[in-house]
């Protein structure tokens, strides 16, 4: 019995060794396959990362190119605004909208600094506290709506008082293009508003307001000259556009006065 047990025991050992010998190459193959799969995954991830980096670089390059194009557009107008836009008829719809947005952003930032500084002023205008996003966004949206109303006013006066077919697109392009010199003035105003020099802030605020109405009158004059038989005199056409602007300001003043009074009257 003992010999039979020894033989069976030896057979079991031999079988286990054969199984281990068979499993060993299989385990090597599985490890090799796993390494290969990991390498393939890494190789797949590399192109994705490279594509992601390339897309980010492309977007940054496109943004920088757009900034350069707008700067070239702005500098070409700054050299001689009236001649370039009014006489030569040079304007651009997309850049005109960008000019309106840039001016609105600059004025909204400077207005918030004036609103913040008004706490310590004698008359106490703007003494109610406004967070940056509140004071900034309200004025920004208000200015964008104001420019939209101005475009509508120029379109309506041109179409019904001067009998000249002017599209909204053309009116926005010319008005935004003529706004470029006002942006240059508003940058100086922003510096004085941040530094909090009330006298210079008031002077440049008045200059900005007069400049906006001046470019509106300049554009109305261009449309009037293009009209062959305008039934109404040019001066009344300008009065009509200014009246629409003042009416809009009067209607919206109760809602916006606490935000922009500090910039208009920094006392």
Curated annotation (Swiss-Prot):
GO cellular component, one term: plasma membrane
Keyword Membrane attached: yes
Annotated stretches, region: Disordered: 1-55
Membrane-traversing stretches: 93-115, 135-157, 173-195, 199-221, 234-256
Location(s), subcellular: Cell membrane
Biased composition regions of type Acidic residues, renumbered to the chain: 9-24
Domain of life: Bacteria
Membrane disposition: Multi-pass membrane protein
Major subcellular site: membrane
Bias-annotated ranges (Basic residues): 29-46
Keywords: Cell membrane, Membrane, Transmembrane, Transmembrane helix
Protein name as annotated: Uncharacterized protein YebC
């Amino acid at each position: 019995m003992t010999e039979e047990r020894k033989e069976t025991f030896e057979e079991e050992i031999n079988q286990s060794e054969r199984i281990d010998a068979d499993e060993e190459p299989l385990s090597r193959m599985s490890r090799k396959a796993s390494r290969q799969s990991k390498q393939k995954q890494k190789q797949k991830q590399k192109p994705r990362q490279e594509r992601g980096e390339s897309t980010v670089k492309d977007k940054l390059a496109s943004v920088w190119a757009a900034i350069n194009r707008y700067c070239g557009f702005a500098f070409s107008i700054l050299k001689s605004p009236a001649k370039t836009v009014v006489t030569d008829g040079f304007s651009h719809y997309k850049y005109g909208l960008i000019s309106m947005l840039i001016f609105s952003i600059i004025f909204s930032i400077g207005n918030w600094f004036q609103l913040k500084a008004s706490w310590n002023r004698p008359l106490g205008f703007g003494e109610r506290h406004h967070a940056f996003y509140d004071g900034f966004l309200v004025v920004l949206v208000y200015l964008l709506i104001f420019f939209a109303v101005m475009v509508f006013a120029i379109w309506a006066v041109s179409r019904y008082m001067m009998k000249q077919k002017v599209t909204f697109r053309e009116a926005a392009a010319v008005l935004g293009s003529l706004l470029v010199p006002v942006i240059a003035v508003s940058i100086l105003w922003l510096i004085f508003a941040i530094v909090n020099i009330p006298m210079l802030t008031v002077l440049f605020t008045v200059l900005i307001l007069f400049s906006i109405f001046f470019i509106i009158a300049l554009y109305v004059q261009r449309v009037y000259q293009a009209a062959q038989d305008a039934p109404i005199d040019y001066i009344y056409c300008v009065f009509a556009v200014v009246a629409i602007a003042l009416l809009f300001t009067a209607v919206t003043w109760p809602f916006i006065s606490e935000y922009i009074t500090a910039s208009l009257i920094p006392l």
